[in-house]
């Protein structure tokens, strides 16, 4: 594959020039809530550019997985209908953090364009910012001035936000020839089809102030991004990015599955392109730990999948098909991105389950659309509210709603629909902004000398001093008795909540006062926040204090964290290599582990998992930790790591018997410290994600004791020895089963006797046979049972039965024949007429409906009402 060659050669080029090859970060940023998805190579280096993070290298190169399908950068609606829009793409990039700047960056880009990309130098153009004379002069070393163009801020100025690092940028474009347009220069090529941008070089040299001034940065940075798919298309000479390499292979697989042939210029061409792109986006997102859902990123994934299914219907797919395309993707990209290969079964299972659910939704939505058409027959207009509900709740695409409406000579109120859609988007934007605003805390503006030094792996108590105090969201100089707030220490033994492990609690004290630490967090890298309350005295900034962790609680937390690791490994050993952690939480009382698995775990497998963990506890392995370079362990098959996580250069490896994981948490000293392990329960939390909750130590012992007590009580109730409880229960159940059978036989006899009486009460006018009858104090579910039995015995067109319950409430049930439904009638229409005057409620389906009311008309009046409906509707 050309893409594999280009990617490899690009990274090698920069690696040979002292750049560190940094693995792609996940397609979603863990610690940057400002964006839904990773949409550029620089996302994972954002904190470096903002001077919030330091790394051991000053030059880096990456091939970054990107998704643009939500938020500000959203290409979703364009995908399939243009030559180059994609939701998933790869961004090749090189970065300089205070190292080289414009001259070297431009020289590198030119050399790569010729020697790695093998582009014709006579067809390369460059743009620079209109004020960037330096970049213009540097490009003149490689290009004639007539192929260098000056553009405004709109095109050639980059900024991360309204304030902060920013700078001029320079774009490289390739002239694809007159086949793609008659524009003579990039300035005339408004569509960008002929002069195709393939690389953008950003020069971060300014800091924009709140007043809008541009101040020179002390350290200048370089951030570049080259679109791999565009380069492949250019070098392959194809009209679109879809007709070469990986995407063309996925289209070919779709051709094979659908039995249809891809033609780029035909209407079905868009369907092939959408399916190829969306399959790739979904696969990478699921491999990185995302799942379709109803909020934020999960909602976007679900939208992508449903869009692919909708286009698949145009190709004739009526059942799940996306999973069958994924192996072709893994075969071509699995070597560069091993997470695809490791997650293949998970990707396929999630896709298939989502598709199955969506096809069911579409079926329900189609039925609802038919109801909407009936209810709107007087106006011949589907309201915007109904159309929006069908799309938003049931996933029925707007174009399908419009097509069906057209078939019935209906129109859709598009203006209201789009208004409601925009209101929903605005609510979503506000919710996202609200959820993100919590991260903009006072801690971002604190002036601290250095980051907090954590010594808590080895010491649970230390002497330190207070660097800062916070109360009610503001930095303060002191905290007095009974005041709640937070402390930041120069050195701390307190572990801050992260990685699924709850933070420590304890005390911070000196001769002047004591601060009770309730919990500990880390809102930004290197800062540990101790939350709590002054129990006595007063504490002030720069004061010398002693920090003491609650040792007993810490030990319990560490034991549970080690138990979580053992459980994770036991799951993999018992169920298979597809097991991947999808989330975890450990505190001093319990373990919670979420993991990828398509179905409920069999009881015998749960027992095996529990036994295996306890076996490792009894073996009493020393829990060992060591530091290692991430580059040395990143490809290890033995050491568990999570593709959704971002790791620093130096990582911590925790080994506990057969378990080896990258982990920054605290742990037991020996596996035997856990004492005993018990699983509380196992259940689903999302499509393809299961959860196990478990306990260790005294909590596990208490659970075993409670189980023992429960067995004793059951034995007492059953009047049976404990070792014979199961047999006794089976005998009791068999007896109940036999009794239920006898009761059922008696009920059937009574029903048949009653049916004979009901049949005698049937009436017929012309060709309409019907029954209206009152059954005193019958159970409500019996009404439907009687109606169904009657329907099987004689061809009644309408049955209406009602009963009075002991509490005085009336229940009424109606059933109509299939031929009446085909005429457009519904059983609930009848109940509506009967129950509306007396404030009743009703619901049901076309054929049968049930309602209730506190009062009903007298029997004669009720019969008259029902008869009037029959005479007007049926006779």
From Swiss-Prot:
Keyword Coiled coil: no
Binding site for Zn(2+): 561, 565, 663, 667
Cofactor or coenzyme needed: Zn(2+)
Subcellular location: Cytoplasm
Keyword Repressor on entry: no
Catalyzed chemical reaction(s): tRNA(Ala) + L-alanine + ATP = L-alanyl-tRNA(Ala) + AMP + diphosphate
Family recorded in the similarity comment: Belongs to the class-II aminoacyl-tRNA synthetase family.
Name of the protein: Alanine--tRNA ligase
């Amino acid at each position: 594959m050309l893409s594999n060659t280009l990617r490899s050669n690009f990274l090698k080029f920069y690696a040979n020039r002292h750049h560190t090859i940094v693995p792609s970060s996940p397609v979603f940023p863990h610690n940057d809530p400002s964006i839904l998805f990773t949409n550029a190579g620089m996302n994972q280096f954002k904190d470096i550019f903002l001077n919030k993070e330091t790394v051991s290298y000053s030059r880096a190169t990456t091939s970054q997985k990107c998704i643009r399908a939500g938020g500000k950068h959203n290409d979703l609606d364009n995908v399939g209908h243009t030559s180059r829009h994609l939701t998933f793409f790869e961004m090749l990039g090189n970065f300089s953090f205070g190292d080289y700047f414009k001259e070297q960056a431009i020289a590198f880009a030119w050399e790569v364009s010729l020697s790695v990309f093998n582009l014709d130098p006579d067809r390369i153009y460059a743009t620079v910012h209109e004020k960037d004379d330096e970049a213009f002069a540097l490009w003149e070393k490689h290009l004639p001035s007539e192929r260098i163009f000056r553009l405004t801020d709109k095109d050639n100025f980059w900024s991360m936000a309204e304030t902060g690092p920013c700078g001029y940028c320079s774009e490289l474009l390739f002239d694809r020839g007159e086949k793609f347009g008659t524009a003579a220069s990039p300035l005339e090529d408004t569509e960008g089809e002929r002069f195709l941008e393939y690389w953008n070089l950003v020069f971060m040299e300014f800091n924009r102030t709140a007043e809008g001034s541009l101040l020179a940065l002390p350290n200048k940075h370089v951030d570049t991004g080259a679109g791999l798919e565009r380069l492949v298309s250019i070098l392959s000479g194809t009209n679109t990015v879809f007709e070469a390499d990986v995407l063309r292979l996925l289209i070919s697989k779709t051709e094979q599955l659908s039995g249809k042939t891809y033609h780029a210029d035909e209407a079905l061409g868009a369907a092939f392109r959408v399916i190829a792109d969306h399959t790739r986006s979904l696969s990478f997102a699921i491999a990185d730990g995302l799942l379709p859902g109803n909020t934020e990123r999960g909602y976007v994934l679900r939208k992508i999948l449903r869009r692919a299914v909708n286009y698949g219907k145009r190709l004739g797919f009526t059942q799940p098909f996306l999973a069958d395309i994924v192996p072709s993707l893994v075969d071509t990209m699995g070597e560069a991105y091993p997470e695809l290969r490791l997650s293949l079964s998970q990707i396929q299972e999630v896709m298939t389950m989502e598709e199955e659910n969506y096809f069911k939704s579409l079926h329900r939505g189609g039925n609802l659309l038919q109801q909407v058409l009936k209810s709107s027959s007087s106006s011949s207009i589907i309201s915007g509210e109904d159309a929006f509900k069908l799309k938003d709740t049931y996933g029925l695409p707007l174009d399908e709603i419009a097509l069906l409406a057209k078939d019935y000579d209906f129109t859709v109120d598009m203006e209201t629909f789009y208004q409601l859609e925009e209101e929903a988007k605005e609510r979503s934007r506000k919710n996202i902004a609200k959820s993100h605003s919590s991260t903009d805390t006072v801690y971002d503006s604190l002036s601290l000398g250095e980051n907090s030094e954590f010594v808590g792996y080895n010491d649970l108590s230390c002497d330190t001093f207070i660097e800062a105090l916070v109360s009610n969201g503001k930095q303060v100089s002191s905290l007095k008795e009974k005041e709640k707030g937070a402390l930041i220490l120069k050195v701390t033994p307190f572990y801050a909540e992260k990685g699924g492990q709850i933070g420590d609690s304890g005390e911070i004290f000196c001769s002047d006062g004591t601060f009770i630490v309730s919990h500990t967090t880390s809102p930004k890298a290197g800062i540990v926040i101790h939350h709590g309350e002054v129990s006595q005295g007063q504490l002030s900034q720069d004061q010398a204090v002693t920090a003491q962790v609650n040792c007993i609680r810490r030990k319990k937390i560490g034991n549970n964290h080690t138990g979580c690791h053992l459980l994770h490994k036991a799951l993999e050993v018992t169920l298979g290599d597809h097991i991947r952690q999808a989330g975890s939480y450990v505190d001093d009382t319990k373990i919670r582990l979420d993991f990828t698995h398509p179905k409920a775990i069999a009881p015998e497998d749960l027992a095996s998992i529990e036994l295996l963990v306890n076996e490792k506890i009894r073996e009493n392995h020393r829990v060992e930790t060591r530091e290692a370079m991430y580059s040395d362990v990143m490809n290890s098959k033995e050491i568990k790591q999570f593709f959704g996580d971002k790791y620093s250069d130096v990582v911590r490896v925790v080994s506990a018997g057969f378990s080896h994981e990258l982990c920054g948490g605290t742990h037991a000293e020996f596996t035997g410290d856990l004492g005993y392990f018990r699983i509380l329960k196992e259940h689903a939390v999302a499509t393809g994600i299961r959860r196990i909750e478990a306990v260790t130590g005294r909590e596990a012992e208490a659970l075993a004791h409670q189980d023992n007590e429960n067995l004793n009580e059951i034995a007492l109730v059953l009047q049976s020895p404990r070792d014979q409880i199961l047999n006794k229960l089976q005998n009791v159940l068999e007896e109940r089963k036999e009794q239920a059978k006898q009761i059922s036989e008696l009920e059937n006899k009574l029903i048949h006797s009653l049916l004979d009486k009901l049949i005698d009460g049937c009436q017929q006018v012309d060709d309409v046979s019907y029954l209206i009858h009152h059954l005193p104090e019958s159970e409500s579910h019996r009404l439907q049972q009687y109606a169904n039995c009657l329907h099987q015995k004689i061809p009644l067109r309408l049955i209406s039965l009602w009963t009075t319950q002991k509490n005085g409430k009336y229940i009424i049930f109606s059933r109509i024949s299939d031929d009446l439904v085909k005429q457009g009638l519904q059983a609930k229409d009848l109940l509506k007429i009967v129950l509306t005057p007396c404030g009743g409620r009703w619901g049901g389906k076309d054929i049968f409906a049930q309602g209730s009311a506190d009062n009903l008309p007298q029997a004669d009046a009720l019969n008259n009402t029902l008869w009037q409906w029959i005479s007007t509707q049926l006779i």
